[in-house]
Swiss-Prot record:
One of its GO terms (molecular function) is ATP binding. It comes from Borrelia turicatae (strain 91E135). GO terms for biological process: mismatch repair. HAMAP family: MutS. Belongs to the DNA mismatch repair MutS family. InterPro entries: DNA_mismatch_repair_MutS, DNA_mismatch_repair_MutS-lik_N, DNA_mismatch_repair_MutS/MSH, DNA_mismatch_repair_MutS_C, DNA_mismatch_repair_MutS_clamp, DNA_mismatch_repair_MutS_core, DNA_mismatch_repair_MutS_N, DNA_mismatch_repair_MutS_sf. SUPFAM superfamilies: DNA repair protein MutS, domain I, DNA repair protein MutS, domain II, DNA repair protein MutS, domain III, P-loop containing nucleoside triphosphate hydrolases. This is DNA mismatch repair protein MutS. It comes from the Bacteria. GO terms for cellular component: cytosol. CDD domains: ABC_MutS1. ATP binds at G608, P609, N610, M611, A612, G613, K614, S615. The gene is mutS. Keywords: ATP-binding, DNA damage, DNA repair, DNA-binding, Nucleotide-binding.
Length: 860
């Protein structure tokens, strides 16, 4: 440290040294100042003017507007350390200063920094002693959870990072560098903790102290299996950065992985469950279609349901029963949704109360939400709705909370505590509000007593209140008047009564603020004692919101209740893609398609041209199956769905430049994951596997994958391909499907309907033509196609000579499709020739020659 720095700058450098990874907001008077590198970075990110003092770069923001600047930095994934100033304990030194909190993207609780429909997660990953675990917390809702990894660690971790989309991650330094590329950790704000900080004994002690338990078994852990280290990392991080904001974390939820369908990260992305792959917003996702929830808690729960489909038929049917009840009683559902629209985010509000970060509005919003609770209770009781999670004691506590807020918190904008709740507050407020009246009353009393008609009471800051008497009345001044100042034409006086009155008025203002805050804090502490029941209300509202939303959408979109079974089957009659149908509404009618997969016929190969609807058919099947598992009605006329332990969706791929992986390698990695982890109870969706390499290589790989799924995994599968040769496979569980096409003259009409037969042509040249490929290229492609189709053994390479392949099946259909393609190309060539004839600029003789040429072309 430089020896010539000022005491304040030395103080700054000492504090900054403890918060190297944060931008330090250093309080100086009414500003937060930034210095050195923080000033350089802060001025650039916040658009502030950069200045210098004694060659030290600096910039600052006013304290009263600092929230806006902090928000900007948080949105840019920066940490902000807030350093406040206190008293000057050393006359020769600077004011006392300390960091009161470190605000970072993963631990924000201010509603202005949050989205109401998305949880804001901080996660910690621990690999201590090879006990892998993943802990997560949304501090704004106080929910801390942990997932224990006992196998397939990396696949599950990828899944959960995608599922929780954390704002911030805590890992060991060793873990970070080992898995940086495998998990693409550089996408996130990562806190790298020294490996020595990972200690089982310290973790146990810290968790026991925080949760006030004698043994971690009370939290559901075995102390000799230190999975809990990841939860310790979160508790320790919050404790060090947010001081006293741990009170709201009162339990750890241990997730049971086996209760939920496995959706790996690739499947979540490819099915666009909660965000699209274009701008990563929720628009055009399944969530955007299903989200017509009325409450923030309901929106967040819906997102959780979509990412965690249930596997237990009883639990699914319980949820479906509630949806069906509300669907059959749609008037009840609509009234309930009206009530829910008056419910506020009490899950986050009660967390703010627990962390002592509340404002008056929070109490009024709780009260308004409790009013909605009583209305909802009465409505549901009238219709005998079966879902109720409260006992008599809960209901008494809820009424107590409502009564407390109703009688204590003022609705008036300039008052905190309601009149009548506290006598002393009423007295002080009455003095404050009527100060001028008291002064006027006393002035009138002294005027009458002294007979001085011009007597006045004035006030100046340095002297306070005083009487003012002009020269002509000096002789009438009462004896109890105490002279305080003489001017040219007037004298100023005080009285003991005036001094007492002034003191009462001044004290009333100061004491009122302090007493109101004291009483306000007391009310908050009384409500916090009932935080468990308030969180219960939040959970109740969230669930009722989601099931009433499902009921409303089922009625609106003509969804049906699915039947869940333990059989290996997916039978969907006239199913639709929920997202495509939603966004096409009013533009084009969606083409319905059926799906029939059972224990005997479980592998469907789908062929046909691009643009015909193969990918839509694949995705809609997966989405309908998933919707059934979350307890929603589904877009179909009938749906029978066998419980599906995992959905794998390999559709589309792009290269990963940062990892040096080509599109083909990415595709093979995804395929390898499916083949390693799928079971016979899974659903596999694969599209165009084998592209990106040579035709023979791709065909060989695709065939081998189909064979492996059929013979070894035996999972329900939909496999779309342009390798038409695969349609000749013969297997008892193999079904050929294709996209129906209608020919109208020289045009192809894609009907987007699925039929049970192979398509042996992709009509690629036709698709290229309507896409606008230059005609010269199209003509050349036709020539090359004729050459290729004249070769022998084009469609059946030598390695397809096994007994599982039937070469002759579909050969006639193949020839028919090829013949049509060639005829279409000849027609287009002739059409192009005729269209170039300029009839206004040819002689009769030239016309005869052209006609002869046209006749010759039609014959050949």
């Amino acid at each position: 440290m430089r020896k010539d720095v000022t005491p304040m700058m030395r103080q700054y450098l000492n504090i900054k040294d403890k918060h190297k990874d944060a931008i330090l907001f250093f309080r100086v008077g009414s500003f937060y100042e930034m210095f050195f590198d923080d000033a350089l970075e802060g001025s650039k990110l916040l658009g502030l003017t950069l200045t210098k003092r004694e060659n030290v770069p600096m910039c600052g923001v006013p304290c009263h507007t600092s929230k806006d600047y902090i928000k900007k930095l948080i949105l840019l994934d920066k940490k902000v350390a807030i350093c406040e100033q206190g008293l000057q304990t050393d006359p020769k030194g600077p004011l006392e200063r300390e960091v009161v909190e470190v605000i970072s993207p993963g631990v924000v609780i201010d509603e202005d920094f949050l989205q109401d429909d998305i949880n804001n997660y901080l996660i910690a990953i621990s690999d201590y002693k090879d006990y892998y675990s993943f802990s997560y917390i949304d501090l704004s809702t106080s929910r801390l959870g942990i997932i224990l990894y006992e196998g397939n660690f990396l696949e599950k971790l990828r899944r959960d990072i995608e599922k929780y989309s954390p704002k911030e991650i805590i890992v060991s330094e060793d873990f970070y560098y080992e898995y940086l590329e495998k998990l693409a950790l550089d996408r996130f704000l990562v806190n790298k903790i020294p490996h020595w900080h990972f200690d089982k004994e310290i973790a146990m002690k810290s968790l026991k102290e925080h949760f006030n338990v004698l043994s971690l078994s009370a939290l559901g852990f075995k102390e000799d299996e230190p999975y809990y280290v990841s939860s310790f990392l979160i508790i320790d991080y919050i404790k060090n950065n947010l001081k006293n904001l741990l009170i709201n974390i009162d339990t750890i939820h241990i997730n049971n992985d086996s209760e939920y369908m496995f959706l790996d990260d690739v499947t979540q992305i490819n099915l666009e469950l909660v965000k699209n792959n274009n701008d990563l917003t929720s628009c055009y996702s399944l969530y955007s279609v299903l989200n017509d929830c009325k409450t923030p808690m309901g929106k967040r729960l819906l997102r959780e349901y979509i990412l965690n489909p249930l596997l237990d038929i009883v639990a699914i049917n319980n949820r479906l029963d509630h949806v069906e009840f509300l669907n059959n009683n749609i008037n009840l559902s609509m009234k309930l949704r009206d009530i829910l629209s008056n419910v506020w985010d009490i899950e986050r509000i009660i967390s703010r109360l627990q962390m002592k970060k509340y404002v008056k509005k929070d109490f009024l919003l709780i009260k308004e939400s409790l009013t909605a609770f009583f209305l909802a209770k009465r409505l549901l009781n009238e219709h005998s709705f079966s879902y109720w999670i409260f006992d008599v004691n809960d209901e008494n506590n809820i009424r107590e909370i409502y009564s407390l807020i109703d009688c204590s918190i003022s609705k008036e904008p300039d008052e905190l505590i309601q009149h009548g709740y506290n006598f002393e507050i009423d007295r002080l407020r009455e003095i404050k509000n009527n100060a001028s009246k008291y002064v006027d009353d006393y002035l009138n009393f002294e005027r009458n007593f002294s007979k001085i008609s011009s007597l006045k009471i004035r006030r100046i800051n340095v002297r306070g209140l005083f009487f003012e008497v002009t020269k002509s009345y000096y002789g009438q001044v009462p004896s109890h008047f105490i002279e305080s100042q003489t001017l040219n034409s007037v004298k100023r006086y005080k009285t003991n009564k005036l001094i007492e009155l002034e003191r009462d008025i001044n004290d009333a203002e100061d004491n009122l603020l302090a007493l109101e805050q004291e009483v306000f804090d007391d009310i908050a502490s009384k409500i916090v004692k009932h935080s468990v029941v308030i969180k219960k209300i939040a959970n109740f509202f969230a669930y009722v919101d989601v099931v009433s939303d499902f009921a409303y959408l089922a009625k609106k979109n003509e969804y049906v209740r699915p039947t869940l079974t333990n059989n290996k089957e997916i039978i969907l009659e006239c199913s639709r893609h929920p997202v495509v149908e939603h966004y096409m509404k009013g533009v084009e009618a969606f083409t319905k398609n059926s799906v029939k997969i059972d224990n005997d016929k479980y592998f469907c190969l789908i062929t046909g041209p691009n643009m015909a609807g193969k990918s839509t058919y694949l995705r809609q099947t997966a989405l309908v199956v998933l919707m059934g598992h979350i307890g929603s009605f589904v877009p179909a006329n009938q749906a029978i769905i066998g419980i599906t332990d995992k959905i794998f969706c390999r559709i589309g791929a792009s290269d990963n430049i940062s990892k040096g992986e080509s599109t083909f390698l990415v595709e093979m990695n995804e395929t390898a994951n499916i083949l390693r982890n799928a079971t016979q109870n899974s659903l596999i969706i694969m599209d165009e596997v084998g592209r990106g390499t040579s035709t023979n290589d791709g065909l060989a790989i695709a065939y081998s994958i189909v064979e492996y799924i059929l013979e070894h995994i035996q999972a329900r599968s939909l496999f779309a391909t342009h390798f038409h040769e695969l349609s000749a496979i013969k297997h008892d569980s193999f079904v050929n499907l294709s996209m129906k096409i209608e020919r109208q003259g020289d045009e192809l009409i894609f009907l987007r309907e699925v039929e049970e037969k192979p398509s042996l042509n992709s009509y690629g040249i036709y698709v290229a033509r309507i896409a606008g490929i230059p005609l010269k290229v199209i003509e050349r492609a036709n020539v090359i196609l004729k050459s290729l189709t004249s070769r022998e053994h084009l469609y059946v390479p030598e390695f397809f000579t096994s007994a599982t392949l039937v070469i002759n099946d579909g050969e006639e259909a193949m020839k028919e499709d090829l013949s049509y393609e060639l005829e279409l190309n000849d027609y287009l060539e002739l059409k192009n020739f005729i269209s170039k004839i300029d009839v206004n600029n040819i002689t009769p003789f030239q016309a005869m020659n052209l006609l002869s040429e046209i006749i010759l072309k039609t014959k050949t």
